[in-house]
């Protein structure tokens, strides 16, 4: 009786172990390159090197990171500035080297389903323009980033180009220089200037510009005539003597 029970249990254990082995084999095949899941053959790596001209890699790589499509994949730099980002499926990715002390231009890497790599510049303005880059990537720093805008220094040009200053200076220059440039003794010219000033002076509460111009020109002409008459009078008196 004991022998029969022992034989029954041994046969049952053999059957259970066979079922477990048969259930594990298809799962392992599914995870391989030919299975339905994503295996190691469908994953690739992005390689490259980051360089800062004139600076040793040990001075800046500790705070730098390599980002692929934002923070979807993150890589770290080695002591010589090289980096490898593993476990990346096929597709198009933007690779960036982020450092608080130095700025690097991003690079787009296209990975085909067969593992062929193609690197190019990232151009957000002209997306159709393709400028090829060598692979593995050679990312060179363009200098320190500018976190602050430099304050503009004060200059005389800023003062002179101020609208308030121009509104005060230009009319003064016109009133001072215009009588010297224009022939004020010509009555026709004077009449045209008075008419143009009256057209500009539409507000009746303001002083009449034409009256001001007339007084200005008449005072000059009367001064000239009086000086001329005084000279002629003196010359006539001298002749009489």
UniProtKB/Swiss-Prot annotation:
The gene is Emc7. It is found in: Endoplasmic reticulum membrane. Residues 180-241 are cytoplasmic. Keywords: Endoplasmic reticulum, Membrane, Signal, Transmembrane, Transmembrane helix. Residues 218-234 have a biased composition (Low complexity). The lineage of its organism: Eukaryota, Metazoa, Chordata, Craniata, Vertebrata. It is a single-pass type I membrane protein. Residues 23-158 are lumenal. This is Endoplasmic reticulum membrane protein complex subunit 7. The chain crosses the membrane at residues 159-179. Residues 216-241 are annotated as: Disordered. Coiled coil: none annotated. Residues 1-22 form the signal peptide. GO terms for molecular function: carbohydrate binding; membrane insertase activity. Component of the ER membrane protein complex (EMC).
């Amino acid at each position: 009786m004991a022998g029969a029970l022992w034989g029954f249990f041994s046969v049952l254990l053999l059957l259970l172990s066979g079922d477990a082995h048969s259930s594990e084999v298809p799962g392992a095949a599914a995870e391989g390159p030919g299975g339905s899941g994503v295996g190691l053959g469908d994953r690739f790596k992005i390689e490259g090197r980051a360089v800062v001209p004139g600076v040793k890699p040990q001075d800046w790589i500790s705070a730098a990171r390599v980002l692929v499509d934002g923070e979807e994949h993150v890589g770290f730099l080695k002591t010589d500035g090289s980096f490898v980002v593993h476990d990346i499926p096929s597709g198009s990715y933007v690779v960036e080297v982020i450092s608080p002390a130095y700025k690097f231009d991003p690079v787009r890497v296209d990975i085909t389903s067969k593992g062929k790599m193609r690197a190019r510049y990232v151009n957000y303005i002209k997306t159709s323009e393709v400028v090829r880059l060598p692979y593995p990537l050679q990312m060179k720093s363009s200098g320190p980033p500018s976190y602050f805008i430099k304050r503009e220094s004060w200059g005389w040009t800023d003062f002179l180009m101020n609208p308030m200053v121009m509104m005060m200076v230009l009319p003064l220059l016109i009133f001072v220089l215009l009588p010297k440039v224009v022939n004020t003794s010509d009555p026709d010219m004077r009449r045209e200037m008075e008419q143009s000033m009256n057209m500009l002076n539409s507000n009746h509460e303001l002083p009449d510009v034409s009256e001001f111009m007339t007084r200005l020109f008449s005072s000059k002409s009367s001064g000239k005539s009086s000086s001329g008459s005084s000279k002629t009078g003196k010359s006539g008196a001298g002749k009489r003597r």
